[in-house]
From Swiss-Prot:
Purpose of the protein: This protein is one of the two subunits of integration host factor, a specific DNA-binding protein that functions in genetic recombination as well as in transcriptional and translational control.
Presence of keyword Transcription regulation: yes
Organism annotation: Cereibacter sphaeroides (strain ATCC 17029 / ATH 2.4.9)
SMART domains: BHL
Protein name, entry field: Integration host factor subunit beta
GO biological process: DNA recombination; regulation of DNA-templated transcription; regulation of translation
Subunit (UniProt): Heterodimer of an alpha and a beta chain.
Gene Ontology molecular function terms on file: DNA binding; structural constituent of chromatin
Entry superkingdom: Bacteria
Record flagged with keyword DNA-binding: yes
This protein's encoding gene: ihfB
PROSITE patterns found in the cross-reference section: HISTONE_LIKE
């Protein structure tokens, strides 16, 4: 599912909201998650999961084409840990 499909699904299930309103809401939610992570905050959506930022140390990597050693700088990467409800839902038979 892509963002536009999510917006359409929410709009279909909430006829009192226009698609433009739903799009603004969805974009605001994503933007707030991104801003919180940029500040280093953790974002928890109970049952669904939690977004956080992890630091990766600098390291020596390899260019897959040439095999040459390449310095990879330290960086921050987003991390998502699934919530119990999501895990249970995915593993029901």
């Amino acid at each position: 599912m892509i963002r536009s499909e999510l917006i359409q699904k929410i709009a279909d299930e909430n006829p009192h909201l226009t698609q433009r309103h739903v799009e603004r809401i969805v974009n605001t939610v994503f933007e707030e998650i991104i801003e919180a992570l940029a500040r280093g905050d953790r974002v928890e959506l109970r049952g669904f999961g939690a977004f956080s930022v992890k630091a990766r140390d600098a390291r020596v990597g390899r260019n897959p084409r040439t095999g040459e050693a390449v310095e990879v700088e330290d960086k921050k990467v987003p991390f998502f840990k699934t919530g119990k409800l999501l895990r249970d839902r995915l593993n029901t038979k």
